[in-house]
A protein has these predicted regions:
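Conserved helicase motor "Helicase C" RecA-like lobe of SF1/SF2 P-loop NTPases
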Residues: 434-461
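ATP-dependent helicase/translocase motor core
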Residues: 1-217, 222, 226-242, 258-262, ...
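A short beta-strand element within the Helicase C-terminal
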Residues: 487-488, 493-510, 516
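Conserved small/polar residues in nucleotide/adenosyl-binding loops
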Residues: 515-521
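Conserved two-lobed SF2 helicase motor
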Residues: 259-273, 480-495
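Interdomain helical connector at the RecA1-RecA2 junction of SF1/SF2 helicase-like NTPases
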Residues: 332-426
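SF2 helicase catalytic motif II
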Residues: 281-320
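Conserved helicase ATPase core of P-loop NTP-dependent helicases/translocases
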Residues: 461-489
C-alpha cells in the first residue's frame, strides 16, 4: 500500500511502534498508547451536563511506571514529519516531560529540552533512542546522581485490588518532591487546589521515601482530628495493613510510643496544653527524618505559631508544606519558610482538566446586606440591652449584631431553592460565621423543613467542633447514606475533608470562599453548585 494512503493508525502499527520496540522499549512496562490524561472539562447548559474532549497523547514512554520520559505524536504521511510538534510540546509541558517525538512514517522529529544545542533534530527510525539513553539524559538534566537514583526511581505504591492510579498532576508533584529530597533539598512547598488529592499525593511521596529507606521515621501534621483520622483510614491504611506489624500510629492523650515509623498528630496533640510538658519534646530533635505539614497555611507560618515551633525543634528533618493557598501577609509567609512552591496545580486547572466540576454562583441579595442596617435610637435587643447606635453591615452580622430574621430568611431562601429544583435530598453545607451562627442556622432550617425533620431528625445537623453532629461526618461523606442532608458548620469543614457527596454549598460568611468552593468541586456529582 502506498504510504500516502495509510491511516494514522497504519503508520503507527507499521512504522512507529516497531521503531520504538527495536530501540529496546518494553511494550508492557514502558509503552502506553492513546493515553488520556485529563477527563475533559465539564460544561453545564441549563440542566444538560457534558464533558469536553480529553487531552490524549498517542504514546507516552516511561522509564518506570509513573516516571514518564517522552511523548510521541503520530500523523499520517500526508503531514510533514514535524507536524503535531506544537501540540506535543504543550502536552509535554503539562506532563513535565522533557523529550518529544513526532512522526509521519518517514522518520522522527526529536525535540530535546535537555540539549544545549540542536534542540530539535530529525532521526531515522533506527536512530530512536533507547530507554537507557533517555534516562541518562534525564538524570543529567535533573542533576540526579548515581547515589540518588535509587530514591528517584523507587516504585510508587500499587495495590492490584485498587483501581486508583495517580493523576498526571499528582505524578508531577510526587516526582518533583522525591527528586528534590533526593538532591538534598530540606524545605519544600507543594500548592494544590483543594479537592485535587493532596493527601493521596502526600502518601505516595511518603511511601517512596520510606520504601527506599531514605526517610525512616515520618510525622504527618494537621490541625484537626478529621484531617488525621480520615487519611489513616483511607490513603495511608497500607502502613497498618499487617495487624501483626503495624507501622503507623496517632499521637494522642500525650502518649508517646517510639516503636512506630509513621506518626500522625494534630498540632494541639504534640504541643501540649497549659500545665503539661510539650509532648513533641518527648522525641529527640533528630527522631523524625521527614515531616509533612498538611494545610500548612492554617497553622500559620508566624515565628510563634504551633507548627513553626515543632518544625524548628525538628529542624534537621526534611519538611514539606502542603496547601491550596499559600499564606502571604505582612507577618506570615509560607514561602519565606518553605521556599517557592516546587509544583502548583490550581483550581482553574482542575476545572479545565475536568477533575473538578465548575460551579454556578447563585447570589441572593438581602436588603440589610446590600443597604446596611442602623437601629432606631434607643432600640433594645430581646434581652433588653440597648443596641449601639451606628451603621452595621455584613461584616457585623452574626458577630457584633445578630439579626434573627436575616438567619430565618437565609434558611427560607435556600430551602425554597432546593424545593424548586427537586433537590431536597441533595447534600448541602452551610458555612456560617461561628458556632453560634451555625446553631441558629440549624434551628432555622429545621423550622423551614419540618416535614422532613419529623421523618428523620438527622435531616439537619449542626457539625461544629465539640458538637454531637461531628459523629455524623462519615455518614455525610458517604454517598450511600441519605442522612444528614443539610449541615451547618463554621470552620470544621472549611478545608481538607473529603466530602465529594456535596451538591450545594451556601456561604453565609465572608471567609475563604474559593477554598470552600474548591473543596466541594470534586466531579462525582452534578456540577451545579
Amino acid at each position: 500500500m502506498n504510504k500516502k494512503q495509510m491511516s494514522e493508525q497504519d503508520i503507527r502499527t507499521k512504522y512507529i511502534t516497531p521503531a520504538i520496540l527495536a530501540a529496546g522499549w518494553d511494550r508492557d512496562l514502558q509503552i502506553r498508547e492513546e493515553v488520556s490524561f485529563t477527563k475533559g472539562k465539564i460544561t453545564v447548559r441549563r440542566k444538560i451536563v457534558k464533558r469536553g474532549e480529553q487531552k490524549r497523547a498517542d504514546y507516552i514512554l516511561y522509564w518506570k511506571p509513573n516516571i514518564p520520559l517522552a511523548i510521541v505524536e503520530a500523523k499520517d504521511n500526508n503531514h510533514r514529519i514535524a507536524d503535531g510538534m506544537e501540540q506535543a510540546l504543550n502536552y509535554a509541558e503539562i506532563l513535565d516531560i522533557p523529550f518529544v517525538f513526532t512522526s509521519n512514517g518517514d522518520g522522527f522529529s526529536f525535540y530535546d529540552k535537555t540539549a544545549e544545542h540542536n534542540v530539535q533534530i530529525e532521526l531515522a527510525f533506527d536512530q530512536f533512542p533507547s530507554p537507557e539513553e533517555l534516562w541518562a539524559r534525564y538524570k543529567k538534566f535533573k542533576g540526579i546522581t548515581d547515589a540518588s537514583e535509587k530514591v528517584v526511581a523507587q516504585d510508587y505504591y500499587y495495590n492490584p485490588n485498587d483501581d486508583r492510579k495517580p493523576r498526571y498532576y499528582q505524578c508531577n508533584a510526587i516526582n518533583r518532591a522525591v527528586e528534590a529530597v533526593a538532591s538534598g533539598q530540606n524545605r519544600l512547598l507543594l500548592t494544590m487546589a483543594t479537592g485535587t488529592g493532596k493527601t493521596y499525593t502526600a502518601f505516595q511521596i511518603i511511601y517512596r521515601l520510606w520504601k527506599s529507606r531514605t526517610k525512616k521515621r515520618i510525622l504527618f501534621l494537621a490541625d484537626r482530628n478529621v484531617l488525621v483520622d480520615d487519611p489513616m483510614r483511607k490513603d495511608f491504611k497500607f502502613f497498618n495493613a499487617d495487624s501483626n506489624n503495624r507501622k503507623m500510629t496517632k499521637i494522642r492523650d500525650k502518649k508517646v510510643d517510639k516503636a512506630y515509623e509513621v506518626y500522625f498528630a494534630i498540632y494541639q496533640g504534640v504541643t501540649g496544653q497549659v500545665g503539661f510538658a510539650d509532648t513533641y519534646k518527648e522525641f529527640s530533635p533528630d527522631f523524625f527524618d521527614l515531616i509533612i505539614v498538611d494545610e500548612c497555611h492554617r497553622g500559620s507560618a508566624k515565628d510563634d505559631s504551633a507548627w513553626r515551633k515543632i518544625l524548628e525543634y525538628f529542624k534537621n528533618a526534611t519538611q514539606i508544606g502542603m496547601t491550596a493557598t499559600p499564606k502571604e501577609t505582612k507577618d506570615t509567609s509560607n514561602i519565606e519558610y518553605f521556599g517557592e512552591p516546587i509544583y502548583t496545580y490550581t483550581l482553574r486547572q482542575g476545572i479545565e482538566d475536568g477533575f473538578l466540576a465548575p460551579y454556578k454562583v447563585v447570589r441572593v441579595g438581602i436588603d440589610k446586606d446590600l443597604e446596611g442596617y442602623r437601629p432606631t435610637k434607643g432600640k433594645r435587643d430581646k434581652y433588653g440591652i440597648e443596641i449601639e447606635d451606628r451603621e452595621y453591615n455584613i461584616k457585623d452580622y452574626d458577630k457584633n449584631l445578630v439579626l434573627e430574621k436575616r438567619t430565618e430568611l437565609v434558611a427560607k431562601r435556600v430551602s425554597d431553592f432546593l424545593k424548586k429544583n427537586n433537590s431536597r435530598f441533595a447534600k448541602t453545607i452551610f458555612f456560617c460565621v461561628d458556632i453560634d451562627h451555625a446553631a441558629r442556622m440549624a434551628q432555622a432550617l429545621r423550622n423551614e423543613n419540618g416535614d422532613l425533620v419529623r421523618q428523620n431528625p438527622k435531616y439537619v445537623v449542626q457539625m461544629t467542633s465539640g458538637s454531637e453532629g461531628v459523629k455524623e461526618l462519615e455518614n455525610f461523606m458517604t454517598a450511600d447514606e441519605p442522612y444528614p442532608v443539610l449541615v451547618t458548620t463554621s470552620k470544621l469543614l472549611t478545608t481538607g475533608v473529603d466530602a465529594d457527596t456535596v451538591k450545594f454549598i451556601v456561604l453565609d460568611s465572608n471567609r475563604s470562599e474559593e477554598r470552600r468552593v474548591g473543596k466541594e468541586c470534586r466531579s462525582r456529582w452534578s456540577p451545579y453548585h
